[in-house]
Amino acid sequence: VYGDEFAEEIHELKRKSAAADLMFIPARIRHLGTDVNSVILANMRDSLPSNVTVISKTAADRILADKDGTVLGVEAGGETYRCKYLVAAPGREGAEWFMKEARALGLETQSNAVDIGVRVESPAEVYEPITKICYESKLVYFSRSFDDRVRTFCMNPYGFVVTENNAGLQTVNGHSFAHKKSGNTNFAILVSKQFTSPFNEPISYGKYIASLANMLGAGPIVQRLGDLRDGRRSTVERIRRGLVRPTMPSATPGDLSLVLPYRFLKDIMEMFEALDQVAPGANSRHTLLYGVEVKFYSSRIALTNQLETKFRNF
């Protein structure tokens, strides 16, 4: 278990972070690893009672409810599944679908922010002062230029950068194994953007930004931080000369300034300056940036204290 917030080392990390205008949020975490996680999930599935049926590879199409305010079930894969109780957990990829369903049902919604940024990859030694103490370090920064909320997310010591497919849109993510290790640490730097009226399509906005990277790079783009600062694209040769060996060699060397708006780039650059005070070397010109990473969130639904919508048992 990592991240005992009462440890002396955690207190020192908080002090260093505060001096760099960063808020350090400790989290106690037990790391399983992608390889072990699949075993645990299989054990959970096998432990379910015999009268529980799990239907996989089947997307929910429509939520059914009557005019009297009671949920009836769902339509999925050409079948109708009736139920007394319905729990909706659409995940990030289902956020847009769930928003449409909520509107169709007349549920009161409030748009969430969208998080847009990059996946960072550096030598693992750079972040060892943090990751040895707290595996999942959460650092929050409010940018000087725009007062935007910028945060680190999903840190993977000795991990790997991977492609994530969001309904045909290729974005980036990261993971780590329990046994197999790389020489790098990766994590996301995300800028949170909450839009105001009249614009109310944060998911569409995030997908558009991600589509620009796909258009320019036929998938995710990778760029050295130094090249981005100097206003030039990264090339295969520049990546090869760098000190960081990319764990996702399929990414196309390119220029993220052609993808991310200036506001997001400025926020990310400021975040690196702050991180460098806590983990010297974070702001190195050899640091690799993969783009883009986007986190979509479902709209907030008006709920009772029992987490129930206006439809009974939903």
How would you name each of these model-derived features?
Residues 1, 5-314:
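Residues forming the flavin
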